[in-house]
Amino acid sequence: MYDVTEWKHVFKLDPNKEISDEQLEAICESGTDAILIGGSDNVTEDNVLQLMSKVRRFLVPCVLEISTHEMIVPGFDLYFIPTVLNSSHPDWIVGLHKDAMKEFGDLMSMEEIVPEGYVILNEECKAAKLTEANTALDIDDVRAYARVAEHLMKLPIFYLEYSGTLGDIELVKETKAVLSDTVLFYGGGIENAKQAEDFAQHADVVVVGNVIYDNFKEALKTVSAVKKSS
């Protein structure tokens, strides 16, 4: 079984975006610790399955981050299930999770399921609007959510999601300071190796996504930058 506590760098691929076979091979053989497949826009069972089947040709762990139960397909190494702690709608905290377990609980291996405590901090991103997230949070609010995730909910991952914009590195640093066992993931706005290296000094895992599609060569450089910093 894969141990997320040993990860430092993750590439996140969107099933709704185009990537060539050559680029996918380079991503999968880059030295990243995992490939995370997920998104919030036009993600379907078909495009998830198509992308997963290509990633599975390589040895890198392949993970599905579930945003709707319609996208759940077998064959992944792990299934990340976000609970959006700062959502104002109960569906995104536990409701959709119950529905997924009702439909797929008998079919899934519980050892493959990894819950994530998500805090979305970019009010303009699609994920924030979809989940009705309260993004008007200060550092103390986020640190409190981190403590809830680790000590009350016993979640293995706490994910700070800025989704498309670079986050507050001081907030990441302060959040990490209150976590002991829960792994801190950071995602959002990483456009170059220097930014990846900076955030890797505070987050346990840096997730790199959009730059794959905007500046592929720079995306590849983030792997060594994160590993060097960690």
Swiss-Prot record:
One of its GO terms (biological process) is glycerophospholipid biosynthetic process. Pathway: Membrane lipid metabolism; glycerophospholipid metabolism. Belongs to the GGGP/HepGP synthase family. Group I subfamily. It catalyses: sn-glycerol 1-phosphate + all-trans-heptaprenyl diphosphate = 3-heptaprenyl-sn-glycero-1-phosphate + diphosphate. One of its GO terms (molecular function) is heptaprenylglyceryl phosphate synthase activity. Keywords: Lipid biosynthesis, Lipid metabolism, Magnesium, Metal-binding, Phospholipid biosynthesis, Phospholipid metabolism, Transferase. Its EC number is 2.5.1.n9. Prenyltransferase that catalyzes in vivo the transfer of the heptaprenyl moiety of heptaprenyl pyrophosphate (HepPP; 35 carbon atoms) to the C3 hydroxyl of sn-glycerol-1-phosphate (G1P), producing heptaprenylglyceryl phosphate (HepGP). This reaction is an ether-bond-formation step in the biosynthesis of archaea-type G1P-based membrane lipids found in Bacillales. It comes from Bacillus pumilus (strain SAFR-032). Its cofactor is Mg(2+). This is Heptaprenylglyceryl phosphate synthase. HAMAP family: GGGP_HepGP_synthase. Pfam families: PcrB.
